[in-house]
Amino acid sequence: MAPARSGLALDTLRMAFDTLRAHRLRSALTVFGVVIGVLVVVVVSSILTGMRRNIVQAVEEYGTSNIFAFHLTTGPQLGPRDRAEFRRKPLRPEDGAAVKELAPSVEDVAHCAFLWLDDRSIAHGGEKYSRASLQAVSANYADVTNLSLREGRFLTESDDEHRRPVLVVGHNVAEALFGALGSAAGREVRFAGRPFRVVGVLEKRKGGFMGENEDDNIVFMPYRTGRIVAPRASDWVLLVIRARSGELPLALDQAEDVLRRRRGVRANEPSNFDLSTADRIIQQFDGITAAIGLVAIAISSVSLLVGGIGVMNIMLVSVTERTQEIGVRKALGARRGDIVRQFLVEAMALTLSGGVIGVLLAIGVSRLLLVLLPALPSQVPPWAVVAGLTVSIGVGLVFGVWPARRAAALDPVEALRYE
């Protein structure tokens, strides 16, 4: 009995694909909507998966036991920032010192000021780098954020105390200015109209939010030096709080309590600053990807609906064209279930072919994006491929039911007489 059923299933599949091959152009036009729907889902999924992988790597490089304190909301977010946030008072290095002193679960606190200058270029000889990200940091910043040096040293307490004109630069900065010269440590550069000496170069960092890690474009200087170079442009301070091993939740609560008291926040008021951890930043990004994913699903659903309606229409046309064939099969003993099965398999084979084409195109597009836009990470997840193919089969099953039932309901006598 089992071999007979297996043979019947193979015959049904063979007939389905023979029908598709006999009407190749019509079949291709019919599944276009399915192709687009699957293509959109898989491509968007691949981009979001690649971006998530990179942001997890970048955040975890800074340390999974670190807390990031800032007066504005941090982490990836959709939409414009609330303007009320810009009225908040920035944090100060003294706030970090208080957290370190008063929070028992905090091991160390570093601070970093972002230097917002019109001219961010740094020059050496005839070379100039204009994409530098300028930050004035404490001497312990490298230890707290797990930064590694390729050569030279990091900034010291003495550099900060004496406001020395020294810099530590990222991988991209060093390659642009000193690539042909080899070593960068000890060389003089000009920045903000002043001479500075490079004392260290950072190791190349792993991928960031859009592929490239911004730390590769970094230029660090001592915090007090930064206050001289840009006295008004260095007010925004980020505190990086390192919790003791296994005490991150306690450190988070203690740091929040200390900062709320220092900033005069009442018990019934929300905090006028933001505390983030690696897990929170990843959760924020996951929320964004979920929203983008819903939009992609909505777009692909429209395409799949259009494709499904097209499949249903073409299958109804096929029922009309093959009325006599259906009559012959019924006269030879085919049951209603056999006719339903045949037309359902044809509909699912049609939409599955569209799903396969959509997946193959999506893989090609993802690889092309990696070549043309390296900063836009793309990694096709296996679940997206499986989901795309499964949905395409489901579309054929749903929209093939009516034509299949209509074919099965034909009277064999009337079908044989159909012209």
What are these model-predicted stretches?
Residues A123, A132-D159, R163-A267:
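Mid-to-C-terminal secondary-structure elements
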Residues L252-A255, R266-S300:
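Peri-transmembrane interface segments
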Residues T12, F17, R21, L25, ...:
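Transmembrane alpha-helical interface segments in multi-pass membrane proteins
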Residues T49-S133, N140-D143, E175-A176, R227-I228, ...:
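Hydrophobic, regular-secondary-structure patches
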Residues H23, M51, A69, V99, ...:
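Generic structural signal for small/hydrophobic residues in well-ordered secondary structure
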Residues R53, E175-A176, I363, R367, ...:
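Transmembrane helix-loop junction
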Residues A404-E419:
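Short cytosolic juxtamembrane segments of multi-pass membrane proteins
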